Structures are given as structure tokens and as C-alpha cells.
């Protein structure tokens, strides 16, 4: 097994390929500014730029965490207990998708994980850690952890409100790190109406609302989205939207509709 580590400490440049570095850092900074997260970590089983190997033994980790925390994480060997890196983590399984999970659920059943999250909070990473699954059209899975500082809003309500957005953003990050380059061939499979439906779905519209906007029947919208799922090799609507976003088939939506 090999480990590729891409580190942008506190959203600053690092030693890595200039093109990948510039584009990815700009994306991560934009995501931070749009959703108000503190830090982003993305993990997937594969090598940087390889979007073809399913269940690879290799590991790529992309992060914006402070260098001081990364050093502490290493010295404490938190890797061994971090729920995102466990063999049975649900984010990488072939039979699961569209997961957005508050890691407090893991902390509630494992004291070691609770200690890890408490230590991370003490060091300024935030008090809410949300792990979000992602999968590219070839079936390669990944997981993004977004950290937030949430004080006034209930954690469950916050997660429910942000879930569609986080799933989309995790898909975009995953596609960027995997280096999927077949967007044109995938896009050519989709009809204009299928793309329209995906675009409005990304903006949080229901099937009925999309039907009204496009002046078509609701069942026609359902059919278009079902066809798009099949063409994008996705198991559900949320995953199809995230994949379309990650490949640049549709543009990233504004966040206002989730507020």
C-alpha cells in the first residue's frame, strides 16, 4: 500500500504539481467560503489522478488542516482509531451511497473516537465533523470530512439542512482528486433535458417543481433523472447530481436555496 498526501495547511499553497495545486486549492477555498466550514479532508482508495481502480489498496488523503494538528494527529496515532480510516467504514462500501454522517455517532459508541474529536475541538478544528461519501462513475469511492463550528443551531437540523450541498461538494472534490477526464464522453450520453433536470435537482428542486419549471409532466422528469442515473452509473438521484457536478456537466449551484 502507498499513501499520497496532499496538504494545503490552512488553505495555503504546498509542494505539489502546480496545475493540480492551483485548481484544487481554489476549489477548496471557494467551498470554505460558501458553506462556512473550517477545514476539509478528503480520502479515497487510489492514487492521485487515477479514477479507474475500484477497492485499491493505495490511499490518497487531501487536507487543509493546520500543520500543528497533523503533527499531533500523527504523534497520537489517531489514524488507528479515526472512523474514516477503518476497514469497515461505510463510505467505501459498494452497497452504500449518499452518506452524510455526524462523527459524534461514532464517538457515542467509542471512547477513543470521542477523545479524538474532543482533542480536535480543543485545537480549533470545530465542534461538528461531518463525513460524506462520494463515488465517481467508475465506482471508485471516497469520503470528505467537513468540520464546522456550530453553536446556535441543533446539530441534527444543521446536518439535514446541509446534507444535499455537502453530498454535491464531496462529489466535486472526489472528481477533482481522482482526475476523471472522461467528462466529455459522459456528457455526450446525456440529453439536454436530462442535463436540465440534473441542474435543477442540484438547486434543490423537487420533481414537481422541475416539471413546472420545464413545462413537462412530473413522470417525465422522473424518467429523465432515472436515465441520467443509469448513464452516470449512479445508484440514486443524489449521487447522479454529485457526479454531474464533479465532472463539470452542470455548474455548482448557489448555496442560498439551502439557507
Swiss-Prot record:
Stretches of the chain forming a coiled coil according to its record: none
DNA-binding residues (ranges): 207-226
Keywords, sorted A to Z: Activator, DNA-binding, Quorum sensing, Repressor, Transcription, Transcription regulation
One Pfam match: GerE
Disulfide bridge positions per record: none
Gene Ontology molecular function: any one: DNA binding
Region (C12-HSL binding): 76-179
Matches recorded under InterPro entries: Sig_transdc_resp-reg_C-effctor (IPR016032), TF_LuxR_autoind-bd_dom (IPR005143), TF_LuxR_autoind-bd_dom_sf (IPR036693), Tscrpt_reg_LuxR_C (IPR000792), WH-like_DNA-bd_sf (IPR036388)
Note in the entry: As bacterial aggregation is one of the initial steps of biofilm formation, the clumping phenotype observed in the vjbR mutant suggests that B.melitensis might be able to form biofilms.
The name this protein goes by in its record: HTH-type quorum sensing-dependent transcriptional regulator VjbR
Organism whose genome encodes this protein: Brucella melitensis biotype 1 (strain ATCC 23456 / CCUG 17765 / NCTC 10094 / 16M)
Taxonomic lineage of the native organism: Bacteria, Pseudomonadati, Pseudomonadota, Alphaproteobacteria, Hyphomicrobiales
Gene (name only): vjbR
